[in-house]
Amino acid sequence: MIDAPQPTPPDACTRILDAAEAIVQARGVAGLTLEAAARDAGVSKGGLLYHFNSKEALLGALLCRLALFMEQQYRAAIEAQTEGPGRVSRALLNWGFGDEGCTVTDEMHDRAAAVFLAAFHHDRALLDPIREVIARMRADMAADGLPPGHAGAINAAGDGMFMARLFHLYTPSEAERAEMRAALGKLVETAR
């Protein structure tokens, strides 16, 4: 009998980034030290310093990884939609309010929230990779073929849902979420 190949364990850089995310999620940016990230990643401090020579470099890498993840999820959400006016807005609606085609989990949102807060409190310039992704998204929304303000309203509502989760302000019930989604969906229907 042939054994199935074992999955390759994550490389040291990925383990360090995963550990840093978990630390900022559990203890905030103040809890993130190079020593703690190295320990939790199972590498020496020298091994960590080989990849990231400072806390700022580590946080910067976390934000770049998050920006890449956001861009990939956003593009996948668009690809899942049919061509034509409102495609970007439908994707944003599904991404922000949930749909079978979206793969972002609560755990991913929580980790993203922790990284956003860590960067915001440590050095707001670290958010520049995220700002670049958002600028591309906004350009796509402007060219989406909907009446002015419709795509922006859908995006702002999705951002509001993320902020409510980020700051633990409230969690809408599934019924409330469905009602909001239906109301926002009417903004997209104008394009059809």
Predicted segments, located by residue:
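Helix-turn-helix
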Residues: 15, 19, 23-57, 61
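Hydrophobic alpha-helical connector segments
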Residues: 72-111
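Generic transmembrane alpha-helix motif of multi-pass integral membrane proteins
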Residues: 113-120
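N-terminal intrinsically disordered/low-complexity leader segments
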Residues: 1-11
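Solvent-exposed, amphipathic alpha-helical segments
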Residues: 19-26, 73-76, 157-164
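Short, basic, alpha-helical segments at the C-terminal edge of helix-turn-helix-like DNA-binding modules
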Residues: 64-69
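Hydrophobic/aromatic-rich alpha-helical bundle segments in the mid-to-C-terminal region
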Residues: 103-107, 124-192
